[in-house]
């Protein structure tokens, strides 16, 4: 067929299949996305469609026909105990059984990335099956398991949880992660002052100094929302119900909302409520397709065997660009205040978060856990230009670490589906990991629900939720990468100041379509 006769879809597919930097599996993934996006979009009200087309609202490139939930958090403990009739597996009897069963089920857990975004609360899951094994025997098995995950499920949105208790499996995972320094899986330690011993938290801090993992979550804060042990931290720090997950994620560009506002009062009384309503309309439309037309919840063995419950999936009401919105509103009001620099601007930011939280809490959705969406400070996507992720401070001129934490902490109470701020510290912190412990505890005391740190000089760094190796970015365009998130980090490096800013990295979640 002559090139002039090729459709846009054919041209995009041709770019994918001839890409020199994608593996066959990655090409298959992107080709499937192109096919899905060739289908009609779920029916939307006119105002919602306009907001989506103008970029005031973004659907995260999830696809035009949501035939699976964005994030799935199976009840892995139930699976290990009972096995699976569908997979013809008996329950686990020892640690080898448990690890083998998990590696099988992971390949049957769907997500927006086509790989599992949640691996379970691994230490709590595996410890009952350790029995008489020595610590050395546990370490060998966990290290082998960790290497298996990185090699067969190479997606850094894949996320494991550990803590708050101290177990031999907890220590084995920390040792394996520090030694191997893998991009995948990502890791969150759930901290609880009443359960977590001081020496374990110090070990976690040493790991952060070594490989920028794990992320630390304030367990008691999440316990109040989901109840203890009934949630998981997944992907880019999304807090979601266990045995359920996140059905969809749609995000509001607050900068674009501010650009359409004539004043601060107009922003709060007219434009913000208007676009919040349009976002709920998009969420409802996408969830209607998932629940009523895709047949996922009717046919999935995960539902039939009690590993997930359709009523425990929550749509995520995302936002980003708060910093730019605040600065624009201040400028239009004739103020010199800047977000992160002045109390007036910071208070305006807190007011925006509070109004978003109030709207989400008081607006029912057609399909969702407790009939509500969950508010999420979305961490950006790799193609974002000119916006700061979530409620973060603008890049490049962040204040000292303590002021930084005190400034962003008041936002954290509002975002039940997760919020993250990346604190990048000088390499000298490696000589005093106890200082990192104190920063974390101080952040939690100030009200933060999540604590995330990168250490300057480490090759393994965090591009918000997901990890990349800096050494992989330079060679990606020539050689490609077996890890699905390297290309996202490379695109972020081109579109943002990720490699030019102060020691800290920009946060970007998944972009769902291939771009060269």
Over which residues does each language-model region extend?
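Short secondary-structure subsegments characteristic of cysteine-rich extracellular domains
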Residues: 336-359
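A conserved active-site cap/scaffold subdomain adjacent to cofactor or substrate pockets
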Residues: 272-276, 318-321, 326, 330
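Conserved phosphate/anionic-ligand binding catalytic regions in large, soluble enzymes, centered on
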Residues: 117, 309-325
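Conserved catalytic cores of very large enzyme subunits
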Residues: 2-311, 332, 338-342, 361, ...
């Amino acid at each position: 067929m002559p090139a002039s006769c090729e459709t846009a879809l054919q041209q995009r597919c041709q770019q994918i299949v001839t890409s020199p930097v994608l593996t066959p599996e990655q090409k298959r993934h992107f080709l499937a996305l192109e096919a899905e996006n060739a289908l009609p979009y779920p029916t939307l009200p006119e105002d919602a469609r306009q907001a989506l087309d103008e970029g005031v609202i973004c659907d995260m490139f999830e696809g035009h026909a949501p035939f699976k939930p964005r994030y799935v958090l199976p009840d892995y403990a139930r699976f290990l105990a009972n096995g699976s009739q569908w997979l013809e597996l008996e329950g686990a009897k020892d640690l080898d059984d448990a690890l083998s069963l998990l590696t099988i089920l992971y390949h049957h857990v769907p997500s927006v990335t086509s790989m599992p975004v949640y691996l379970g609360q691994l230490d709590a899951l595996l410890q009952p099956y350790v029995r008489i094994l020595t610590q050395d025997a546990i370490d060998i098995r966990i290290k082998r398991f960790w290497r298996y995950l990185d090699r067969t499920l190479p997606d850094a949105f894949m996320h494991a949880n550990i803590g708050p208790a101290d177990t031999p499996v907890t220590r084995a995972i920390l040792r394996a992660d520090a030694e191997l320094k893998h991009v995948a899986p990502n890791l969150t330690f759930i901290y609880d002052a009443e359960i977590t011993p001081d020496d374990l938290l110090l070990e976690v801090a040493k790991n952060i100094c070594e490989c920028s993992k794990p992320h630390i979550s304030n367990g008691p804060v999440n316990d109040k929302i989901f109840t203890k042990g009934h949630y998981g931290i997944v992907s880019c720090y999304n807090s979601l119900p266990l045995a359920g997950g996140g059905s969809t994620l749609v995000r509001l560009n607050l900068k674009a909302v501010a650009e359409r506002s004539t004043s601060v009062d107009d922003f709060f009384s007219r434009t913000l409520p208007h676009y919040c309503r349009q976002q709920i309309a998009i969420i409802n439309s996408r969830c209607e397709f998932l629940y009523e037309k895709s047949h996922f919840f009717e046919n999935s063995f995960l539902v039939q065997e009690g590993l997930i419950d359709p009523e425990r999936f929550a749509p995520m009401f995302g936002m980003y660009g708060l910093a730019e919105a605040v600065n624009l509103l201040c400028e239009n009001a004739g103020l010199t205040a800047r977000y992160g620099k002045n109390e007036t601007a910071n208070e305006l930011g807190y007011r925006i978060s509070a109004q978003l939280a109030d709207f989400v809490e008081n607006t029912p959705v057609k399909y969702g856990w407790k009939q509500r969406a969950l508010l999420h400070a979305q961490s950006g996507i790799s193609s974002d230009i000119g916006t700061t992720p979530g409620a973060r401070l603008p890049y490049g001129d962040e204040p000292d670490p303590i002021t930084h934490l005190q400034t962003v902490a008041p936002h954290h109470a509002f975002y039940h589906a997760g919020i993250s701020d990346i604190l990048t510290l000088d390499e000298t912190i490696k000589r005093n990991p106890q200082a990192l412990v104190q920063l974390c505890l101080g952040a939690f005391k100030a009200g933060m629900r999540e604590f995330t740190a990168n250490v300057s000089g480490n090759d393994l760094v965090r591009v918000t939720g997901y990890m990349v190796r800096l050494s992989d970015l330079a060679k990606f365009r020539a050689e490609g990468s077996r890890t699905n998130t390297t290309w996202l980090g490379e695109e972020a490096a081109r579109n943002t100041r990720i490699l030019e800013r102060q020691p800290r990295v920009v946060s970007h979640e998944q972009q769902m379509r291939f771009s060269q």
